[in-house]
Amino acid sequence: MARAKFERTKPHVNIGTIGHVDHGKTTLTAAITMTLAAQGKAKARNYEDIDAAPEEKARGITINTAHVEYETDSRHYAHVDCPGHADYVKNMITGAAQMDGGILVVSAADGPMPQTREHILLAKQVGVPNLVVFLNKQDMVDDEELLELVELEVRELLTEYGFDGDNIPIVAGSALQAVEALKANPKIAKGDNEWTDKILALMDEVDAYIPEPEREIDKPFLMAVEDVFSISGRGTVATGRIERGKVKVGETVEIVGIRATSSTTVTGVEMFQKTLEEGLAGDNVGLLLRGVKKEDIERGMVIAKPGSITPHTQFEGEVYVLTKEEGGRHTPFFKNYKPQFYVRTTDVTGSIVDYTSDEGETVEMVMPGDRIKMTVELINPIAIEQGMRFAIREGGRTIGAGVVSKILK
């Protein structure tokens, strides 16, 4: 049989498994690929393959992540699974593997544990909009009431962190039983095995509950300025990569950040020395701007659809601080520490006003390897939005990675 080529006919969604260590995230990932492989919609991956996740670098941080892909009748999924807890924290904060939704795995035998709580909090902070729950290890719970109790506990926890705990789909099953059954018979059809059917039921919920993400090209236009030069007789050109949306010749745009916001008209879009009618998300372009002097615009500003983004100086961020081994600091830092915040294309000096723990208590000292919530005050206003990623740098080296969880001012 000839190999079918990859058809981009189905909508694509990025998801991942989250939850406490040893609750069965990787086993579930294996079970999903094996169950869907039995229907010809995935390549079966066993636990060992997924667990030996390769190292990746994102924003100067090493993260172990396994990527698998599979399809359901209606969608194509890219699924990430991390072997270690620290990898999850780094992955979610750096956005190395963007998630449109997550499958929260909770062991029915143990109920929610500290990392269950931490991953739900992180999902909320970094903007993973929707979760579906898999209550794993159902085969180890004989008492139906106990299962209901765990479900209730999970729903309360989700509600506590601002998710729709009452309506989030929860499916109980056993990833291990499904994997064992599929090892014995890789071609199990729907309806032949209660455990693999539960995996299919979970995927039905994921299909139905996790909405399709808005495509980058459909979002409002934004390009971070990387370089600026003047072309005599034509005006000023700002270059950069279009982060989202599209821009056409003749459109009005705003220049945001560092100085007062100004507006101008795009009189030309160029790519590789060729003129275009429009630039699209992902393109590296030069924009010719009417009536803008070279000194009016600099790296670190953004050019965006009018009214779509505003400059700010104060925000709350969820930050992972690099360890010494990762090339971070060797010593802790304290309040009023003044590093550089690298946002999109530029470093801006800022001062850290305070630190807060997950429990909402003030923290005096932050150690390398910590994850912490911090309030940052920048010396210059720049275009910032919720969910935006940034790096914290000191003398040109990255010492932390963060995501904006709330804009204050």
From Swiss-Prot:
Covalent S-S links between cysteines: none
Binding-site residues for Mg(2+), renumbered to this chain: T26
Sites where the protein binds GTP: 19-26, 81-85, 136-139
Keywords: Cytoplasm, Elongation factor, GTP-binding, Hydrolase, Magnesium, Metal-binding, Nucleotide-binding, Protein biosynthesis
Region span, G2: 60-64
Family per record: Belongs to the TRAFAC class translation factor GTPase superfamily. Classic translation factor GTPase family. EF-Tu/EF-1A subfamily.
Role played: GTP hydrolase that promotes the GTP-dependent binding of aminoacyl-tRNA to the A-site of ribosomes during protein biosynthesis.
HAMAP family to which the protein is assigned, alphabetical: EF_Tu_B
Protein name: Elongation factor Tu
Gene name of the record: tuf
